[in-house]
Amino acid sequence: MSAILPGYAELHCQSNFSFLQGASHPEELVTRAGELGYAALALTDECSLAGVVRAHVEAREQKLPLIIGSSFTLQAGADAPPLDLTLLAQNREGYGNLAELITLGRGRAAKGQYLLTPADIEAPAGDNAHLRGMPDCLAILAPPPGLAAERLAEQARWLAAQCPGRAWIGLTLLHHCRDDLHRAAVEHAAHASGLPIVALGQAQMHRRSRKPLHDTLAAIRTGRSVGQCGYDLAANAERHLRSRLRLASLYPAQALAQTLAIARRCTFSLDELQYEYPDEIVPAGHTPASYLRQQTYLGARQRFPEGMTPAVAAQVEKELALINELRYEAYFLTVYDIVGYARSQGILCQGRGSAANSAVCYCLGITAVDPARGNTLFERFISKERNEPPDIDVDFEHQRREEVIQYIYEKYGRQRAALTAVVISYRPRSVLRDTGRALGVDNGIIDAVARAHQWWDGKKEMLRSLAACGLDPASRVARQWAELAETLMGFPRHLSQHPGGFVISRGKLSRLVPIENAAMPGRSVVQWDKDDLDALRLLKVDVLALGMLSVLRRALALAGQRRGRPLALHEIPPDDDATYDMICAADTIGVFQIESRAQMSMLPRLRPRQYYDLVVQVAIVRPGPIQGGMVPPYLRRRQGREDITYPGPAVRKALARTLGVPIFQEQVMQIAVDAAGFTPGEADALRRSMAAWRRKGGVDKFRAQLVGGLLARNYTADFAQALFRQIEGFGEYGFPESHAASFALLAYASSWLKCHEPEAFLAALLNSQPMGFYAPAQLVQDARRHGVRVLPADVLYSGWEASLQDAPGAARPAVRLGLNLVKGLREDSARAIEQARVRRPFADTADMARRAGLPRQALDALAAADALRTLAGHRRLASWQAAASAQSRDLLREAVIVETETPALPAPSEGQTVAADYRSVGLTLGRHPLALLRPQLAARNFQTAAVLNTYPNRRLARACGIVTVRQRPQTAKGTIFVTLEDETGPINAVVRPELIERQRRELLDATLLGIYGTWQSVDGVRHLVAQRLVDLSSLLGQLSQDGLAAASRNFH
């Protein structure tokens, strides 16, 4: 039958990257077009190219010609209707013009919007003059059905004049009651303008079954329920990709033939895009290659004062030769320049990821991992056979990274530099809220269901939540809600900005990819995300934020002040026994990477005693090694409970440092090369497939080559198959060795500071919030258990940030909390207090309020936080004086006023004080809340953490504490790990799926949780395996009328 059907190319198709309009993914549209036998498909999202790379990749798989285009609504003024225009790129020049037009429209409007007028096509001004008539683009007028015939004819004549020989008028027939009138109007306009008519489907769905979702998106877009949308809903489901048989019955043959004529003229492919690196960093008299060589060897003299070893020197030369062959010098120099700027400003930074495999990056100061210390594999970073740009990730202090970002913008300009986009997609709770509102569900039910839903919950749990909220799961509304939520999950909602992935080009970046405004002032983003850039092999530079770098710089500065001389990162002793003793004891709250529950459970078993042990420690607690079954054999071998064996010398070479067990991706690559006969490029392709095998089954295509290569070199079939199973495990997230090596340096440095400079480390952690695994309350409690004296925030002594304060006769300083912990206090108010205090001490609260010019809100916040205690007494007195002081007028700011006598108000109880501390500062320096509740808890036989830690293995036990962390790792098969805190320390608990099923509410809702279970203590790892849970949060109400506001860290 296909032989007698007319050919057809859909020239107006919108995906779900026309946010809240299209109801299908780009890949779904491409696949469906291929199934229907279309000659081509044009993706024409509204003023956007955000979905074209996904469509391009799928079209390449389907061998379907993809036309790159975009649709626009041009605002013609108050007296004229908008003009709906579709533009299609004929060639590379046309594509660049299209991308620039999108950039122009997006740049004029707030995030997520655009503004274009007919004048932007007819007579664009200034730098955009070359866009006049949109050269090398084909233009199709796509009028709505209700547009008056004369208005349509007027628009057609205008378009014919602007794009002579490149313009059409589109006819869209969707089985509307006015199709005949619309067709007549189009024919009239075509006759009046001389434009040919072309068939347009204006598809927004790949199948008609998406119509309910299409209606739901319209409701979400307009902020109403589906029942209230009326004519804003499509009248039927015809805006899907229709069969050619159906199209032939609707459209004139000539209109269908025109689609093929247009498709033949549009020959552009995204594969034609060529990226050019910035080149202005190279000074006169140098080529990029000579300048990179010069800077590399200058850096080598600093990195290796006694000279490079022959192996390192050979590695540098090998890398420089390959970089030169692939013409990547400008990329390395761009990153070198950015890192150089950061260092010149005193901003701590460090490269990580596969770049740490590079000796050149180490010499340039981009990375901190000495290639002589590691088992680097340069092919993990750059491969000639891969023929794609390397990826250099550089971490900067999170509180100063914006300075680096603005430097890049200033150096290269907004026309040449922009951040990578991140596609924000629907997640469970946002899906439930939006679809529930669209269906008209009561807001109370929506809130209850959304709050109860967790990221791992499926349709069954949602229906159970509906039942708990009084909605019949079998009802039509419940079923629709569940089905729509399931379909909408993962749909793109809007574009956001990447944490720091920059695209920088030699010429106009807007001719490569459209640029639009970000929500944050002073930022702009391209319309593609990192996966899009990778798919097209386009370069990006990752300027990332890392909180621990802020902590390290601050802690080193504070420690240097205490010691009376500067302390630098490289001066930290590398093999400190006390530091490793602390690490082995899992005493790592607050340190980098090894502070999580899983890492702390592993530390007593792995017992790191040197740097490379930390590299393994950082990497081994990852889904990849866990799923691949690498962890148990490594631990057994490390603990001497299993022989260390190697099937052959090539395997020994790759795995000797990890006791014969593959932990890192680089090791798999090396085995593939040395033991299975892979080329370095093939090995890297294997590595890349590891991350994609669950999605695409890509790793399977290497099974025969890997297993066959091992068998051909006399390795056993058992070993070959076992190795491949381990490789499959890397399909889950795992660290490359180079990445783990970079992070291990920071893990050790932060551990050393915690061990030897605990006061400076705590102050730095508090001043670098928000970051890390633990809230300030847990960090302070842990520090105090280690003997650190912590003083409260006080307006007479505190600055905005925490500081070190000496005390007469004390061997070590105390940590004075900063005013930044006071909830509701602005930084400018705290700075004003500091400045006024320098001039002369405050006489009382009123004196401080007048001289610092504090508003009533600031005074109330300080009183609530007990930061006025030295001036005014306890909280109630302070609140009274704050209220009285707020009446002072600005003109009396410097006058001395005699206040009326403050009434004798009773001091709050200890419990009230503790509760108020948590509400106003987020922590307490008084007794722990559970110390106050201990008599009630002891009556129920709940033991403290200190007592539990003395229990033998498999003893029945009871614990109670404030929930500080809930975690559900994907590798834990549904188990949730809970951390409680009492007055003596943390308690780790394990909650199995069957108990979660029975006591979900207690587990997820309790602030104070009691756990009955069995204590486990093996190899220094201790936890309570839960058998019953009790929500004891009501006990906290005894501390004060308002209870205790303590937030846990849930499932982050």
UniProtKB/Swiss-Prot annotation:
CC per GO annotation: cytoplasm
Gene3D superfamilies according to UniProt: 1.10.150.870, Metal-dependent hydrolases
Taxonomy, superkingdom: Bacteria
Cellular localisation: Cytoplasm
Keywords noted in UniProt: Cytoplasm, DNA damage, DNA repair, DNA replication, DNA-directed DNA polymerase, Nucleotidyltransferase, Transferase
Gene Ontology terms describing biological process: DNA repair; DNA replication
DNA damage recorded as keyword: yes
Keyword Iron: no
Catalytic activity entry: DNA(n) + a 2'-deoxyribonucleoside 5'-triphosphate = DNA(n+1) + diphosphate
Protein EC: 2.7.7.7
One GO MF term attached to the UniProt entry: nucleic acid binding
InterPro entries: DNA_pol3_alpha_NTPase_dom, DNA_pol3_finger, DnaE2, DnaE2/DnaE/PolC, DNAPol_HHH, NA-bd_OB_tRNA, PHP_dom, Pol/His_phosphatase_N
UniProt record similarity statement: Belongs to the DNA polymerase type-C family. DnaE2 subfamily.
Function: DNA polymerase involved in damage-induced mutagenesis and translesion synthesis (TLS). It is not the major replicative DNA polymerase.
Protein name: Error-prone DNA polymerase
